[in-house]
Amino acid sequence: AVAQALAQALDLPLPAASWHGEQDRMADIGAALALLTGTLGHLARDLSLMMQTEVGEVAEPAGAGKGGSSTMPHKRNPVGCATVLAAATRMPGLAATLLAALPQEHERALGGWQAQWATLREMACLAAGALDRMRDLIAGLDVDPARMRTNLDLTHGLILGEAVMLALGADLGRLQAHHVVEAASRRAVEQGRTLRDVLAEDADVVRTWGDAAKQRLDALLDPTGYLGDAAAAVDRVLAEHDRRRA
């Protein structure tokens, strides 16, 4: 009755048997915490890379005690990301401890369960701390769309060559379209020009699209219009999130 009441108070299921002889549940929850923290670490890694001076697309929330430098007052260090990454780095070793404790003799073998509880407690604290820090990061993240667009334009349209190739391939055939765009890309790099300008002068492109060539190239080489399945993927993820919370 006490166990049932505790389970209800914590909104947890009541196991059919005691944990004394079933050590897998400790490893199971530890693995879940490690996976959660590892996922947060992946996000923190990407955010920290996006904060680099050369990229500069995002920044952690500014404020007193948030990423300032003792010697360089202009800096906004990714201290939140560092905290999450530190937790994610420690988690695999802690999870390994729980896995190592699985083959215990009899019930609650000496040393095994003592290692489990200390490890599980630490993993819970690390996961909770990483989750709390990431929540603050996302809520206050400073995003620079203009810098993102600048970075997209660094290749002068080359990253969108595939879009042109696919559209041109519908008229010329894929292999010929690939040849045209590949050759135009080389000329753009050699001449220091945009892919759009080089393609607009290409004989195959002009012959295929005629007076509409420049207009079509402008549309195809606009990165905001080349999102693929991204919007649908986001909708699917949000729908799955709502379904699991229901």
Regions found by a protein language model. Give the residues of each.
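Internal glycine-rich alpha/beta core junctions
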Residues: 1-104
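Glycine-rich cofactor/substrate-binding loops
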Residues: 72-246
